[in-house]
Amino acid sequence: MTKKITVLVCGGGNGAHVTAGLAASRDDIETRVLTTFADEAERWTNIMKENDLRITVDEGDIKSGESVDFKVKLNCITKDPSKAVPGADVIIFTVPAFAHQSYLEAIEPYIQPNTTIVGMPGQPGFEFQVFDVLKDKAKQCVIMSFESLPWACRIAEFGKFVQILMVKVNLMGCLIRGQSKPSYDPMEAVQRVMGKAPILTQANNYIEPILATKSIIHPPIMYGKWKDWDGKPIEEKPLFYQGLDEEQARYLGGISDELVATAKAIAAQKPEVDLSGVLHLYDWYLRDHKPYIKDTTSLLTVLQTDTAYDGLVHPMKETEDGKFVPDFRYRYLTEDVPNGLVVTKGLAQIAGVPTPYHDEVIAWCQKQLGKEIIVGDELKGKDIGSTRCPQRYGINTMDALVNIM
């Protein structure tokens, strides 16, 4: 018989609704929710007095293909970490990367040895941040980070109804055990929350998913599209992926080349670090998006003809006269630069790999964000503290990178 575990879900958004709902539907899981945003916990608690949380899975049960529709009751929703954290075996972060710091600081006083802390998604630099906030306590915990949310999902009615629109087949994560000795299998515990799908797979180490991250895709496309923009509003929203041109593809491919070079450099200096899972973006698309791609000639044609991206446009703001200007404060830059591109640049800097494409794109992005992160080709700007690059946490050598494992 599997050991009963207590799962704490951090957050109150789409991912939190689904994660808490799935966990609460399992007989051998006690489920709690911690949401520190405004009065969200109080609102949700009051809703639960009169209602259940309904979850629908549009894709249906993986085996039967029938749609699934079920209801659960959440008995513990709070904004008080002293009530939520003690006794929790697994703590799952479903909030965006910018909120990780505040949640880590909230749970830190109450965290116990052998707890599993899960970033879902963690995003690049999650591990550095956990060790920075939890200090020695982190060494007694299991740290896990997954590459994305397991589903496409949306809240239909806050606290009452959430829809799972798509379930991923596989989801890769990494695991740092440290000195922890949990009485349960951490990967099995998270799989228990998920159910049959997605199937969770484990990366070779925590560095591999950082260099294989997909959060490097948006900034170079934004840069290639808008670097020479004249500031005048345009008539319609341009397609993001399918509107790719050769210039944007050159920057995207160049950044991917630099990641592959960084993986090779780290593996050459530390042969025990297996980074064989770091693929060029072109090869990754051919592997993971193949059914959707009509023309596999190049990275440019792959994105232009990827039907999974049908209709996806650049983040834009509408002007008073119904035209459009680019939104440079959208998550494509606000999230994917400090918690993506800057982290991969940081690894390359430690490995001694030149990154002209990273440097050029980051230099433009930081202007749009009003930050100074990169100076020349080095991460030493005054706003380095707003990123999750290893240098921010005093990690500047290959030994320091590897010692975290």
Curated annotation (Swiss-Prot):
Record Pfam families: Octopine_DH
Signal peptide segment: none
EC number assigned by the record: 1.5.1.-
Keywords: NAD, Oxidoreductase
GO molecular function: oxidoreductase activity
Disulfide bridge map: none
Family (UniProt): Belongs to the lysopine/nopaline/octopine/opine/vitopine dehydrogenases family.
Protein's name according to its UniProt entry: Opine dehydrogenase
Gene: tadh
